[in-house]
């Protein structure tokens, strides 16, 4: 568990945090440049020192301004991966990985190298590596110090799109197989969507929202970030069944289900899906003999006018689903809170 209750002033910027983060999964730190994202992880790592408050990691006090406690970075057991890999140019990859390696991680070296796909790189110098390869090595080096927490400061920001696509699967694999909590700084919605379990949104040094990805994603805090055509819902589902005759998989959503193209996943596997609001249409009665496979009973929570369109907030199985319709459709269907209807879903994207 990471307890953050501190304030810090750097120049004209003030950062104030009072949150407790669980010791598992990935928490994305999201916001515009200057929001306080890097300042937050620098304070946690010990690169800067808050003027007030405390930082406590798994019961160990890293910083207590009142008591004058401020552990040096090397004593905090916190790994840090920067935007630029910062590898030692005169060491080969193997030497970079072993630099600072904890004794407890010696037996894990080969496993971690395989997990990150860097075994073919061990005898190469950093100067011969691509940006994505350098970042994989930097992540491996940080993990081999046996940290209790891993901080990643926009590790994909300096990479072009092909290199980002190269690195994302390795990060996803790490989240599944390495039980180390991570704070992932980013201003990329795509990275957050594919990696994060939770999101903390910072604005001018203040926390505007903090919670599970699917909750924060559907909140008003995220509206300025989402292009109108990309308003969407994030839902947690589980694999219910694979169709015996068609290449389709059913995903459980409360007591209902969604059909998607067949997935290579076992039954009961947990997944996250994304549904664009523009791919959801509404009807008052269940349609007969329709080509749309996904028709879910839903309850209207509210509706909002938005630049000539209407965003309708629905509840399906205790989860939030958004639909975008025209004002004409809203008036004709008499959309209002409490109305039960049916949501027809044309397309579903699997995100994690």
Curated annotation (Swiss-Prot):
PROSITE patterns: ABC_TRANSPORTER_1, ABC_TRANSPORTER_2, MODC, MOP. ATP binds at residues 31-38. It comes from the Bacteria. Its main location: membrane. GO terms for molecular function: ABC-type molybdate transporter activity; ATP binding; ATP hydrolysis activity. It is a peripheral membrane protein. GO terms for cellular component: plasma membrane. Its EC number is 7.3.2.5. Pfam families: ABC_tran, TOBE. Gene3D superfamilies: 2.40.50.100, P-loop containing nucleotide triphosphate hydrolases. Keywords: ATP-binding, Cell inner membrane, Cell membrane, Membrane, Molybdenum, Nucleotide-binding, Translocase, Transport. It catalyses: molybdate(out) + ATP + H2O = molybdate(in) + ADP + phosphate + H(+). Residues 289-352 form the Mop domain. SUPFAM superfamilies: MOP-like, P-loop containing nucleoside triphosphate hydrolases. It is an enzyme of class 7 (translocase). Residues 1-229 form the ABC transporter domain. It is found in: Cell inner membrane. Part of the ABC transporter complex ModABC involved in molybdenum import. Responsible for energy coupling to the transport system. The complex is composed of two ATP-binding proteins (ModC), two transmembrane proteins (ModB) and a solute-binding protein (ModA). Belongs to the ABC transporter superfamily. Molybdate importer (TC 3.A.1.8) family. This is Molybdenum import ATP-binding protein ModC. The lineage of its organism: Bacteria, Pseudomonadati, Pseudomonadota, Gammaproteobacteria, Enterobacterales. The gene is modC.
């Amino acid at each position: 568990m990471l307890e953050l209750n501190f304030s810090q002033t750097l120049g004209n910027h003030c950062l104030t945090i009072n949150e407790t983060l669980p010791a598992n999964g990935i928490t994305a730190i999201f916001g515009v440049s200057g929001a306080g994202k890097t300042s937050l992880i620098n304070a946690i790592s010990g690169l800067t020192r808050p003027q007030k408050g405390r930082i406590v990691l798994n019961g160990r006090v890293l910083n207590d301004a009142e008591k004058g406690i401020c552990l040096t970075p090397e004593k905090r057991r916190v790994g840090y991966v920067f935007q630029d890999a910062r590898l030692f140019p005169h060491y080969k990859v193997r030497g970079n990985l072993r630099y600072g390696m904890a004794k407890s991680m010696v037996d894990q070296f080969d496993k971690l190298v395989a997990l990150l796909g860097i075994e073919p790189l061990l005898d190469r110098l950093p100067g011969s590596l691509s940006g994505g390869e350098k970042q994989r090595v930097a992540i491996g080096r940080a993990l081999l110090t046996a940290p209790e927490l891993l901080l990643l400061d926009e590790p994909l920001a300096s990479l072009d799109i092909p290199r980002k696509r190269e690195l994302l699967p390795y990060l996803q694999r790490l989240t599944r197989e390495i039980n180390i909590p991570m704070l992932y700084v980013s201003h990329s919605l795509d990275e957050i969507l594919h990696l994060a379990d939770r999101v903390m949104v910072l604005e001018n040094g203040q926390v505007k929202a903090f919670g599970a990805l699917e909750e924060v994603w559907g909140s008003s805090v995220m509206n300025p970030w989402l292009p109108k055509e990309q308003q969407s819902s994030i839902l947690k589902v589980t694999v219910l069944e694979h169709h015996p005759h068609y290449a389709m998989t059913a995903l459980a959503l409360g007591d209902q289900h969604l059909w998607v193209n067949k997935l290579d996943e076992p039954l009961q596997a947990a997944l996250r899906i994304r549904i664009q609001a523009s791919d959801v249409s509404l009807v008052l009665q269940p349609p007969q003999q329709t080509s749309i496979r996904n028709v879910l009973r839903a309850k209207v929570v509210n509706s909002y006018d938005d630049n000539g369109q209407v965003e309708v907030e629905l509840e399906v199985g205790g989860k939030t689903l958004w639909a975008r319709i025209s004002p004409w459709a809203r008036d004709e269907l008499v959309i209002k809170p409490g109305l039960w209807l049916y949501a027809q879903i044309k397309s579903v994207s699997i995100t994690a």
